[in-house]
UniProtKB/Swiss-Prot annotation:
Name of the protein in its database record: Probable lipid kinase YegS-like
Keyword set includes Zinc: no
Protein task: Probably phosphorylates lipids; the in vivo substrate is unknown.
InterPro entries: ATP-NAD_kinase_N (IPR017438), Diacylglycerol/lipid_kinase (IPR005218), Diacylglycerol_kinase_cat_dom (IPR001206), Lip_kinase_YegS (IPR022433), Lipid_Phosphate_FormReg (IPR050187), NAD/diacylglycerol_kinase_sf (IPR016064), YegS/DAGK_C (IPR045540)
Protein family: Belongs to the diacylglycerol/lipid kinase family. YegS lipid kinase subfamily.
Keywords attached to this entry: ATP-binding, Cytoplasm, Kinase, Lipid biosynthesis, Lipid metabolism, Magnesium, Metal-binding, Nucleotide-binding, Phospholipid biosynthesis, Phospholipid metabolism, Transferase
PANTHER family linked: LIPID KINASE YEGS (PTHR12358:SF106), SPHINGOSINE KINASE (PTHR12358)
Gene Ontology CC terms: cytoplasm; plasma membrane
Cofactors (names): Mg(2+); Ca(2+)
Amino acid sequence: MATFPASLLILNGKGADNQPLRDAIGLLRDEGVEIHVRVTWEKGDAQRYVDEARQLGVETVIAGGGDGTINEVSAALIQCQGGNVPALGILPLGTANDFATSAGIPEALDKALKLAIAGNAVAIDIAQVNDKTCFINMATGGFGTRITTETPEKLKAALGGVSYFIHGLMRMDTLKPDRCEIRGENFHWQGDALVIGIGNGRQAGGGQQLCPGALINDGLLQLRIFTGEELLPALFSTLTQPEENPNIVDGASAWFDIQAPHEITFNLDGEPLSGQEFHIEILPNALRCRLPPDCPLLR
């Protein structure tokens, strides 16, 4: 274990009192592994800690938190200039952990930590919106975005990813589709969308497989649109007979342009972005990530 490379863990402030994590880090340190720990408090901390990690010369920056933390650390890493950019490690500590789950990251802290420190580093894609904001997992629009942003923190803490589904059922009366136009490579669609998922990864909202065919190293974004007037029948049909569902539109492209006559909001791995025009493109091989050898998101 003493030969493991040095790493810096960027820990979401909500996980600072995680005793099992403290114990796991302590055991690794006792075995000679060099692990620096930094805790985020406010927006911009991840960028500062990534800069510090490069100064320390560590080989891995570990994102300890949920999808939002992973996204923030990833966005900071792709801003690095020059060589010796650390790889990304993932320690799933959030409510839903959608990206980590679909990537096959172990749930056990000790196993996830060892993978994050010494796993094989693979080049993966990341998505960029309007030439500035990034997401590593998925951009969701429509009803799903409102649910994930409005679900109470206490409900998420008590029930985890299931809380999104429960809160969604409670808010069905507010369901309204968003009219928009979406263009991509050999793709064009215009109409009313209940839910829009644009995935580099596969799932969002606590385990919902919105883009089940997505891969994180194929240079493509996967698109899925739920249309129609009723959301529950569309979702049920997706689970039972997705290939026969007329209310589902699928597409794949290295980029998508979205225009709407009114303001709509996308949730980018937990970060809301509102507007009427969105240009979303894939950045191939944008960073290296330590993943399990049988990661289902790799081609």
